[in-house]
């Protein structure tokens, strides 16, 4: 019923609660969150990285100049279509660019802090 999600190793798509999609450099990051199971402290999630497709587009003006643009990976669009059938997301209002940048910055801070803590734990093991 959901061949693209099955291809990602998701065999119980009805357990999917929500998903998020963000762009980092030349990759789209899809994170799928599952319903919290009884006895679990945190809900399980999985992350997938898709490279963005790069295309050369002719710039208008007739001077044979091309510009590289990136767009979402076709496989990712198929996965998102299946996720939307499962999660039935509500349409979101247009996001304020400043707020989006601040949100991305806060996320990056958390990721970096977590990685630093992980490396420090590894260093302590070496002592």
Swiss-Prot record:
Signal peptide: none annotated. This is UPF0325 protein VS_2356. Belongs to the UPF0325 family. InterPro entries: UPF0325. It holds the Pfam family DUF3461.
